Swiss-Prot record:
One of its GO terms (biological process) is protein import into peroxisome matrix, substrate release. The modification N6-acetyllysine is found at K84. Zn(2+) 1 binds at C244, C247, C264, C267. It is found in: Peroxisome membrane. The three subunits of the retrotranslocation channel (PEX2, PEX10 and PEX12) coassemble in the membrane into a channel with an open 10 Angstrom pore. The RING-type zinc-fingers that catalyze PEX5 receptor ubiquitination are positioned above the pore on the cytosolic side of the complex. This is Peroxisome biogenesis factor 2. Pathway: Protein modification; protein ubiquitination. PROSITE patterns: ZF_RING_1, ZF_RING_2. A zinc finger (RING-type) spans 244-284. Keywords: Acetylation, Disease variant, Disulfide bond, Membrane, Metal-binding, Peroxisome, Peroxisome biogenesis, Peroxisome biogenesis disorder, Protein transport, Transferase, Transmembrane, Transmembrane helix, Transport, Ubl conjugation pathway, Zellweger syndrome, Zinc, Zinc-finger.
Length: 305
């Protein structure tokens, strides 16, 4: 029987990382709520909330506490991770939620403690009497003891995995799963697939800049268009001058590279700057010099176009 109880406890034991993640989620939610709340007062007088900031924060945290721990026995972070609080003082092995007094004292220790810490500094700053100085020293001493106790509790939590905060230990509440957790088999198929695709993507990112796109495009166009031989007549230049050998459009600022084909200035210049070994995609002639076209085209041909 004892071994079964121990196995049941170990199966329902919440991981340390899950409890710490729940605390971080709670802090993130508080920051989000406060930032959204302050956005509502941007049009008001500057510093309106600064005077009553501790009280406003306390009211917001009480509102969150009312609809999380008080009603659902779990914080927002715990609800996301399928965790809730259990009364550790209960002798019953079944789940026993925290009592009403434990919930109220949880709010007093967390919300009231933070409010008192923020307000007492303002109180001591505005009063410089000797009696207030002694009270301030006592408060600082108590705060130091609480921080030391929190550190010791955290070290014990790392060792035993129970009571993530000092408040939980003092009130006797700890985190348990909402539903019994089954032992899951870890599969690495998805991870292996992701690693494979990430490796392939990194390989493409490394390889693509090394590919000369302009040269590849010219090579493909030379394969698709049959190579032309030497010019058979004097009219070859005029006939080929109706379209750019690269873009296939009417040549803008027509230039030649030393063969009978005509190019737009931008097409030829950009291709030559991108690849110093640029050749004509139609006849394979290497670039000797980029010269403007000097031969004229009959106006009848222009009108026919």
């Amino acid at each position: 029987m004892a071994s079964r109880k121990e196995n049941a406890k170990s199966a329902n034991r919440v991981l340390r990382i899950s409890q710490l993640d729940a605390l971080e989620l709670n802090k993130a939610l508080e920051q989000l709520v406060w930032s959204q709340f302050t956005q509502c007062f941007h049009g008001f007088k500057p510093g309106l909330l600064a005077r009553f900031e501790p009280e406003v924060k306390a009211c917001l945290w009480v509102f969150l506490w009312r609809f999380t721990i008080y009603s659902k026995n779990a914080t927002v972070g715990q609800s996301v991770l399928n965790i809730k609080y259990k009364n550790d003082f209960s002798p019953n092995l079944r789940y026993q939620p925290p009592s009403k007094n434990q919930k109220i004292w949880y709010a007093v220790c967390t919300i009231g403690g933070r409010w008192l810490e923020e307000r007492c500094y303002d109180l001591f700053r505005n009063h410089h009497l000797a009696s207030f100085g002694k009270v301030k020293q006592c408060v600082n001493f108590v705060i130091g003891l609480l921080k030391l106790g929190g550190l010791i509790n955290f070290l014990i939590f790392l060792q035993r995995g129970k009571f993530a905060t000092l408040t939980e230990r003092l009130l006797g509440i700890h985190s348990v799963f909402c539903k019994p957790q089954n032992i899951c088999e870890v599969g690495f198929e998805y991870m292996n697939r992701e690693l494979l695709w990430h490796g392939f993507a990194e390989f493409l990112i490394f390889l693509l800049p090394l590919i000369n796109v302009q040269k590849l495009k010219a090579k493909l166009s030379s394969w698709c268009i049959p190579l032309t031989g030497a010019p058979n007549s004097d009219n070859t230049l005029a006939t080929s001058g109706k379209e750019c050998a690269l873009c296939g459009e009417w040549p803008t600022m027509p230039h030649t590279i030393g063969c009978e084909h005509i190019f737009c200035y931008f097409c030829a210049k950009s291709s030559f700057l991108f690849d110093v070994y640029f050749t004509c995609p139609k006849c394979g002639t290497e670039v000797h010099s980029l010269q403007p076209l000097k031969s004229g085209i009959e106006m009848s041909e222009v009108n026919a176009l």
